[in-house]
Amino acid sequence: MTEKLSDETRGPLLEPLFATGWELETGRDAIRKTYEFADFVEAFAFMTKAAIWAEKWNHHPEWSNIYNKVTVVLTTHDVGGVSSLDAKLARKMDGLTS
C-alpha cells in the first residue's frame, strides 16, 4: 500500500523534482509543474505518452492543457497527500520531455 511521504522521505524524493521546476501546490499537499511545448500537437503528444504510464501505474494526474502548455498537479488522493507514486510519475513526465 502506498503511504503519504513522511518528513524523512519527502526531501530525498522531492528535492530533485524541485530542481526541475516542480513546486509545492499552494494550500494542499500536492506538487505542480507547467510544461511548455512548441505547439498544441507536442503538448497533446506529451499528455498521450504520460497517460499511458499513468494508466499502467493506476495513478492519474490532475492536469489541464491550454494550447502549448500542460499544467500537472500530482497528489495521491487515497493517502491525502504526496506519495512515492507522485514522485515516480513526476520523474517519468520529466523524462518524456527530454
Swiss-Prot record:
One of its GO terms (molecular function) is 4-alpha-hydroxytetrahydrobiopterin dehydratase activity. NCBIfam families: PRK00823.1-3. The keyword Lyase applies. It is an enzyme of class 4 (lyase). The keyword Lyase applies. It comes from Ruegeria sp. (strain TM1040). This is Putative pterin-4-alpha-carbinolamine dehydratase. The lineage of its organism: Bacteria, Pseudomonadati, Pseudomonadota, Alphaproteobacteria, Rhodobacterales. It catalyses: (4aS,6R)-4a-hydroxy-L-erythro-5,6,7,8-tetrahydrobiopterin = (6R)-L-erythro-6,7-dihydrobiopterin + H2O.
